[in-house]
Amino acid sequence: MNRVLSKGPKGLNGLLRACPSNSGRSFLYHSTYNVSSRTFWSASRLRSEDSPSGSQPLKPDPNDGIGNNTSSASSQHTPWYLQEEALIEEPRQISSRDQIPELPENSPAILPVLLDYIFKDLGLDELRSIDLRGLETPPPIGANSIMIIGTARSVKHLNVSADRLCRWLRSTYKLTPYADGLLGRNELKIKLRRKARRARVASRAGTTVDEKDDGITTGWICVNAGVVENSPVGEQASRKVEGFGNIVGGTRVVVQMFTEEKRAEVDLEGLWLATIERDRRQKQVSIDTKSDAPHEEVRAPTPVQNSSSDHVFGPHCRSSTILPLEQRRGLHSKCRLLGPETEHNQEDGLDDGLDDGLDMSPDSISTPTDQLAANRTCDKEVDTDSLLEHLSGLPDEQVLSELGAGQEDRDSTPFLRRFYDALSQMSTEEAAVARVKLLCTAISRHHQGYSKESLWKAFMTCNYHTYPISDELGFEIVSALLTALPPHQKGPKATGVLPEADRELALRVLEHLSLRGTDVLNMKVFHLLYEAASHPTSFSGEEVIKDVTDATKDRPTSRVAKMIESLDIQFDPEDARKLMMSMFRNGDYDGFWNLWHKLPLYGSPRTSADYEMLFRLHADLRDECRARDCVSTWVPMMSREHPPIPLRGQVVQDIMHCLLIGEPAIDRMARAGSTSNLVLIWNDCKNIALGRGRRGSVERMNVV
């Protein structure tokens, strides 16, 4: 050892410096010899008398390297294992999985809160928001929608997230969301437990379990939050609607939740982004088409004097390029304002056209349709809407005569000639919609030459080509399909027979209307369904209904009434009054009185027409007990209505008719001097009918 290490501090110091350190630092060596750093002086040091002895420390010589290094090392040294390394801040890379997508323009107020909840609380990754509000054709999930797409980590996380989202929307925003593909909490646990049990049994038996479709690993849940904002969307520059229906007020929010594998398989983002891009290109092509040079006039140009009125006729533009099978026409249904220099020429041309196209002889102007065409001197062609409106006001016999032999007949009557002449001047989509209206009118009037199958095909043609069909026209189609067959088609006993096939067609039309955003859960639709349920489906079904009890007889209509009560449909006074009459005529008196009492509660006070309907229905029923109760209860209530209903007019005749049904000998009782309530009402009605005025007996009954 003595041979290896030299004596003294130099040998040990050299050995320690030669050994490498694990931490990359050299060990600090302190000498074993205590070397004093005090400086020796040959002379005694002069000290101040004021300062105490030893109060001033000794200052080392700056040239003394040993003293300087020792003091700095002892005061600043910290062991390496206690030293804190400085944190090097590196720029954090934030992936798309950890980001909340940007909000679309004019988004509802709930959207940022919903995205934050989905991202932070539910823990869905790779969120993506797609704005579908600008699509011309609304998606199947509903018009005016915003779609949110997220990825769950597992099937269990997927179901739990969807369940929590539905509960949060119900409790926080009072919405009614529904989730397609969601399993309940207990149902998911039970299915997972059964799946694990089958896997254990299969592993013991040495077989495998086929898990292609176990009802759990669908990997896709669609949570539709419904309309989250009732305010209508911004008005567009053009009010013309193409595709399914009109603009729907309010914004819908739909959350699509996937597992990672299912999201890559479905590629929902690619589908809708391609649809949005295609829609954008179509709009751009339409804008470019409208911005092209004006079309060349086919006829000789006629100078037009500008009118001083505020009605401005805009220029009609035509594309310079002709697409395959493209046909565009500019239509005018109003009389153009012409200048003085062209008025005479235009009148001559109009007279020539009337002489060529319309027969204005006295023999030809014999029907109301001819008179309508003769009165329209501003247009060479009669508008189809005006023709159909005029046709709807005619009696049934005249309507059947004007419609000719059937839908193949186009020139047997003046109405058909003018209607199809007007169709030839219209665009393809307008002509298709006009044919649908004509079929609805013909079927509703029981014309045998127009079938419901042809109406269904015409509706599907408009649906296929995305022609605009208004909600009113859609309900007219449903009403026409639910029109009962006339008696002479099934024999005299088969009054009001509605086959099952016609009901199925009407329900399919309602399904198509609901898919394009039409609200089909309203009083009007349920009144149509109630009327349809009151008709038998066949001749044999009608005979069975007559032999069963009243409870069985009203069973189809009672189901519709229960649906109206359970769905809490918005109350519509006009449709409610129609439904009341249908309920009374079908024997559903409880439903009738329920709606009767609801009228003033929903801000629709009862009127004189309502009381006329009430007493007329009871008189037609010819039930003595119900007639007496109706008169004794509701005649005094007429003066308590707001505003009061006067006892005059047709309601007096209906009350007297109802009194004769309830008390056939009431006139003899009145002459005998009876003072019963019914006799007092009879006397008042009789005096008013004879022009003597009201004596106030009913008012005295109210006081009593």
Curated annotation (Swiss-Prot):
Report the GO terms under cellular component.
Answer: mitochondrial inner membrane; mitochondrion
InterPro entries assigned: Atp25, NT_sf
Q: Does the keyword ATP-binding apply?
A: no
Ranges of biased composition (kind: Polar residues): 66-76
- Keyword Mitochondrion on entry: yes
Residue pairs linked by disulfide bridges in the UniProt entry: none
Which portion of the chain is the transit peptide? 1-47
Compartment annotation: Mitochondrion inner membrane
User: Which BP terms does GO give this entry?
Assistant: mitochondrial gene expression; mRNA stabilization
List UniProt keywords, sorted A-Z: Membrane, Mitochondrion, Mitochondrion inner membrane, Transit peptide
Q: What is the recorded membrane topology of this protein?
A: Peripheral membrane protein
Which intervals of the chain are annotated as region Disordered? 47-76, 283-313
Record field: compositional bias (Basic and acidic residues):
289-299
Q: Which family does it belong to?
A: Belongs to the ATP25 family.
Its function? Probable mitochondrial mRNA stabilization factor.
Output the PANTHER family linked to this UniProt entry: ATPASE SYNTHESIS PROTEIN 25, MITOCHONDRIAL (PTHR28087:SF1)
Name of the protein in its database record: ATPase synthesis protein 25, mitochondrial
Species per Swiss-Prot/TrEMBL record:
Aspergillus fumigatus (strain ATCC MYA-4609 / CBS 101355 / FGSC A1100 / Af293) (Neosartorya fumigata)
